[in-house]
A protein has these predicted regions:
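Bacterial Sec-dependent N-terminal signal peptides
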Residues: 1-24
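Beta-strand-turn-beta hairpins that frame and shape the catalytic cleft
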Residues: 21-29, 38, 139-141, 160-185, ...
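Structural recognition of the beta-strand scaffold that forms the well-ordered cores
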Residues: 28-31, 89-94, 117-120, 131-135, ...
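Catalytic metal-binding/acid-base residues of hydrolase active sites
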Residues: 35, 97, 185, 223-226, ...
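Structured beta-strand-rich core segments of catalytic domains in phosphoester-bond hydrolases
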Residues: 90, 96-176
Length: 388
C-alpha cells in the first residue's frame, strides 16, 4: 500500500514539474463606451450641435481637455491589475466622433506612453458617433480594416441608418484574430433592430471564418441588450456555457456575470445592465477535458471597476461617474464601465502561417447600402454648407 502511495506521489510531482516548466503569455482585449467623445468643432453634415461651445452642453476646450485626460486614464488602467504596465493589447471603443478625437486621445500621455494607435472608418450615424479600435502595435499588428454596414430588412424603413460593424483583422501572438466592434441601436425603437444586428454580426463572423477557417473572432461592443436578451442569446447565438457552444455558436462569458453575480456595466433605475460585452468564437475555447495551450485560448473576463469611475455621494452613489448628468458637468468618465477578457498562449510554441488576414468583400446589399449612405451624406453636407 505504501509503495502505491509513494508511486502516486511521484507521478503527481512529475506532473507539477512538467506544468511548472510551461510558461504562458497573457493578452488582454477590452471594450469601453466613451460616452460622447466629441471635439468642440462642427462636422459638416452631422448633428453635433449639442457639443459645441454654444450648444446645450456648452462644450468647450476646457471640458474637452478634461474628457480626453479622464478617458485616457481609464483606458490605460484597463487590465493593469492582471498585466501591470502593459494593459490591453486591443480596445474597442464606441461613441467617438471622428479621427481628430482619436488622434487627440492617443496623444494623451497615458496612452502615448504605450504607443497606442487607432483604426476608424466614418459611419452613417447622423449624430456622428462611431466605433473605433485602439491598439498597441508591439502586441497587435493590423492587416485589414472594414466597416460593414447595418443593412435594414424588409420590415424596416429602407432609410434606417445606424452604426455598422467595424472589423479589424490582424495578428495577436502571431495568430489571425478579427475584432468586430458594434454599437447596436438603442432600446427606444424596440428589440427588433438589435435582433437584426445580432443576426448580421453572426453572418459576418461566419463569412470571416469561411474565408479563413483558422481565424479567431472576437465580437465586442455596446449591445444595448443584456446577454440574456434574444439579440445576443438567439440571433448572435452567444451561449453562457462553454460546453454548450457548438461550431456555429459563440461564447458569452458575461451571461453568468450578470445572472449569477448580479454585476453589470450600466446602471438604470438602481439596477445593473450588462450591455458592454466581449464574445468569443469557439476556437478560442478549451472545453472540459481539453487544455490546449498551443494557440490562444480564453482565460477569464473582468468588469473594470477602478474606484474613480464611480459616484461616491449623492442620489446616484455607487453608479458610474458620468461626464454630464442633468445638464451639469461632472468632469467624469462614462455612463458605462469598461470590460476586458484575457487570452493565454504557451510560450515557445510554433505558430502556423496566418495567411493574408484579409477581410471578406462586401456583399451586393452592403455595397448598395454604402452607396446610398454616401449620397445621403453628400446631400446633408450640401444643405449644411448652404445654411452657413
Amino acid at each position: 500500500m505504501k509503495r502505491h502511495f509513494f508511486a502516486l506521489l511521484a507521478v503527481l510531482a512529475l506532473c507539477l514539474t512538467v506544468s511548472a516548466q510551461k510558461k504562458f503569455s497573457v493578452y488582454a482585449v477590452g471594450f469601453y463606451n466613451q460616452e460622447n467623445l466629441f471635439d468642440t468643432c462642427h462636422d459638416v453634415g452631422k448633428n453635433d450641435y449639442q457639443f459645441l461651445p454654444n450648444g446645450s452642453y456648452h462644450w468647450n476646450g476646457l471640458k474637452y481637455g478634461h474628457k480626453l485626460h479622464n478617458m485616457s486614464r481609464a483606458l490605460s488602467d484597463m487590465a493593469t491589475t492582471t498585466l501591470p504596465g502593459v494593459g490591453c493589447a486591443v480596445i474597442g471603443l464606441s461613441e467617438v466622433e471622428n479621427n481628430k478625437v482619436l488622434t487627440d486621445l492617443c496623444a494623451q500621455p497615458a496612452l502615448k506612453a504605450r504607443n497606442y494607435q487607432f483604426c476608424h472608418v466614418e459611419g452613417p450615424d447622423h449624430r456622428g458617433i462611431d466605433c473605433a479600435v485602439i491598439y498597441q502595435p508591439s502586441l497587435f499588428t493590423v492587416k485589414d480594416v472594414k466597416l460593414y454596414p447595418y443593412v435594414p430588412t424588409e420590415k424596416q424603413d429602407a432609410k434606417f441608418r445606424t452604426r455598422g460593424y467595424l472589423a479589424v483583422s490582424g495578428l495577436l501572438a502571431g495568430e489571425h484574430v478579427v475584432v468586430i466592434v458594434a454599437h447596436l441601436p438603442s432600446r427606444f425603437g424596440g428589440p427588433y433592430s438589435r435582433e437584426v444586428g445580432g443576426a448580421q454580426i453572426k453572418a459576418l463572423k461566419e463569412r470571416i471564418q469561411k474565408k479563413n477557417p483558422n481565424c479567431k473572432v472576437i465580437v465586442m461592443g455596446d449591445m444595448n441588450d443584456d446577454p440574456t436578451n434574444k439579440s445576443m442569446y438567439e440571433a448572435l447565438s452567444a451561449k453562457e456555457d462553454i460546453e454548450k457552444v457548438g461550431k456555429n455558436d459563440m461564447f458569452n462569458p458575461w451571461y453568468n456575470v450578470l445572472v449569477k453575480h448580479g454585476q453589470g456595466t450600466l446602471m438604470y433605475q438602481g439596477a445593473w445592465n450588462l450591455f458592454d460585452q466581449i464574445i468569443l468564437s469557439p476556437n478560442l475555447l478549451n472545453k472540459k477535458g481539453h487544455r490546449d495551450g498551443s494557440t490562444l485560448k480564453y482565460w477569464k473576463c473582468e468588469i473594470q471597476r477602478m474606484p474613480y469611475l464611480f459616484q461616491t455621494e449623492g442620489k446616484y452613489k455607487g453608479g458610474t461617474k458620468r461626464t454630464t448628468a442633468g445638464g451639469v458637468w461632472l468632469d467624469g468618465y462614462s455612463d458605462h464601465l469598461p470590460t476586458a477578457i484575457y487570452l493565454m498562449k504557451e510560450q515557445g510554441v510554433a505558430t502556423k502561417d496566418a495567411g493574408d488576414c484579409l477581410l471578406p468583400d462586401f456583399t451586393e446589399a452592403e455595397k448598395q447600402n454604402i452607396a446610398e449612405c454616401e449620397l445621403e451624406k453628400q446631400e446633408r453636407e450640401a444643405k449644411d454648407k448652404a445654411k452657413q
